[in-house]
């Protein structure tokens, strides 16, 4: 009997298209390896689909919000379904670049210089302070990335 794998991809984040591509590639590899694969999208019917399918394991092929941030991992834990990848805490911490870098630095790992700028500090009157902090701590050219997204969408 083949192991049943629920492959979750797509999702609602800005990284949906990347996730769908990942899902197609993972699905092909799993089928080629001999697994029975059901592909599911992250939507309002996900819990019902997982309860009906009762997979042996869930493969999370989501990128960004809800897939890499610990949310889906928490849901799967509640449902009692094993999954591939890190758990809730590790996923949540890793998705947050600022927290991850603080933890890395505490362990003595070298990290590039960075400045965390909130959306509120980009509004007047905080904008000048944010620019001053960037000018003081970083060199141009520089890279701007969202703190809690991956896949470098829009960069």
PLM segments and residue spans:
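Active-site nucleotide/adenylate-binding loops and adjacent lid/helix of ATP-dependent enzymes
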Residues: 1, 5-9, 93-155
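A short, GP-enriched loop/loop-strand-helix hinge that lies immediately N-terminal to
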Residues: 8-15, 54-96, 110-119
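Glycine- and acidic-residue-enriched helix-capping/strand-helix junction motifs
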Residues: 13-23
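A short, Lys/Arg-enriched amphipathic alpha-helix followed by its capping loop at the start of a domain
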Residues: 25-35
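Hydrophobic alpha-helical packing residues
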Residues: 30-31, 76, 104
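A structural preference for short, hydrophobic beta-strand core positions in alpha/beta folds
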Residues: 39-40, 85
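Eukaryote-biased intrinsically disordered, low-complexity acidic regions enriched in Ser/Thr/Pro
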Residues: 40-52
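Active-site charged/polar residues at nucleotide-handling catalytic sites that mediate phosphoryl
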Residues: 53-54, 138
């Amino acid at each position: 009997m083949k192991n049943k794998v629920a492959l979750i991809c797509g999702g609602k984040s800005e990284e949906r298209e990347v996730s769908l591509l990942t899902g197609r590639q993972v699905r092909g590899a799993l089928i080629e390896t001999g697994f029975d694969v059901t592909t599911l999208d992250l939507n309002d019917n996900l819990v019902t689909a997982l309860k009906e399918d009762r997979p042996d394991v869930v493969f999370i092929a989501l990128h960004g919000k809800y897939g890499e941030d610990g949310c889906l991992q928490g849901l799967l834990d509640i449902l009692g379904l094993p999954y591939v990848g890190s758990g809730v805490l590790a996923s949540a911490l890793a998705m947050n670049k600022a927290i991850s870098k603080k933890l890395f630095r505490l362990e003595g790992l070298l990290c590039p210089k960075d400045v965390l700028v909130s959306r509120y500090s980009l509004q007047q009157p905080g904008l000048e302070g944010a620019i001053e902090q960037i000018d003081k701590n970083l060199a141009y050219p520089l890279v701007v990335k969202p703190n809690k997204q991956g896949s470098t969408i829009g960069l």
